Amino acid sequence: MATTHLPPDFKEFLQLLNVHSVRYLLIGGYAVGYHGYPRATVDMDIWVAIHPDNARRVVMALKEFGFDLPEVEETIFLQENKVIRMGVPPMRLEILTSISGVEFADCFHERVVDVIDGIQVNLISLERLKENKKASGRYKDLNDLEQLP
């Protein structure tokens, strides 16, 4: 994935997550591509840890990114099964507080840290990504699972 070029907004958002020390993992299509099956994706999926300090940091990063809406409060990032969407495909950013089949703490401990297009990024590991795809059961996730090494 070393040759992947991230859209400027995605790069900026990842930089802000890093600057604010957010505990996050890149998941979804970008992680699938990183781990060996490059495919089209309509968004960038970011999974964040549910913790008060992390929630505060996520909100700070969002505000600095320009997503400063009254309904985007720390409490959203303290609840499971929440998704915050910004933008429209193919430039949509999605922030998730939980995903199928895996726990954040385990995945963060086993994360892959790499530099993509000049930005240090925390990615879900291949094995945990496969567990997530299998648990999701969606057609596109099962297809990803078949294509991943």
Predicted features and spans:
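Compositionally biased terminal segments of proteins
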Residues: 1-149
